[in-house]
Amino acid sequence: TIDIELQKQLDKPQAWFCKYFPARIRNVSEREIADRKLVFDFKDGRAYEEVAQRTAANMTERYGTSCTNIVFSPVPASTDKKNEIRYKAFCQRVCELTGAINGYDHVSVSGERLTIHENRKAEKEVRKVNVIEFDSAFFNGRAVVVFDDVITKGLSYATYANQLESLGANVLGGIFLARTHYKVK
């Protein structure tokens, strides 16, 4: 079961631009192969212009001129280096295109710590997770749109949105490059 606070975040508006089929899913079309490549390229910092254009178009369509009062903030990647490669130029470009306030510099990944996760077979598994530091004063009282590259169940997005709201922000919803799918229709 999903925590009530996380569900509250998942109930907010979400947009995603393509389907992502994990590499182990083989019988996918050329379109899905191209989408998978776009996801990988974006994660490696290469396809940010195309994704920034789509993201900006979605924000402008949904929020119009009020984009100038919205903070754009991505769910941080697993390390500070990956976060910079994936999001620094991307966030700057989305904010140039929309007039939104760039939240990139107000969140940082400062290291890793161990956590225990229960997996599908109910076995306990120890994983490293990133420690995220926030510029609390910056987010207090702000409307925020959260971005993440891929949404599967939405727990990373919902957890991050909750963290922002605990600082006094109002998360409006999430935008995602892709949504994970496992069955090819």
Describe every region a protein language model picked out.
Residues 1-71, 108-140, 179-182:
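Active-site-facing substrate-recognition patch
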Residues 71, 145, 172-175:
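A structural signal for isolated positions on well-ordered beta-strands in alpha/beta enzyme cores
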Residues 76-86:
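Glycine-rich phosphate-binding loops at beta-strand->alpha-helix junctions
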Residues 86-92:
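Charged helix-capping and loop-helix junction motifs
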Residues 94, 98, 164-165:
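Hydrophobic alpha-helical packing residues
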Residues 146-160:
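A phosphate-binding catalytic loop at a beta-strand-loop-alpha-helix junction
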Residues 158-185:
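A short, conserved beta-to-alpha structural element at the edge of catalytic cores
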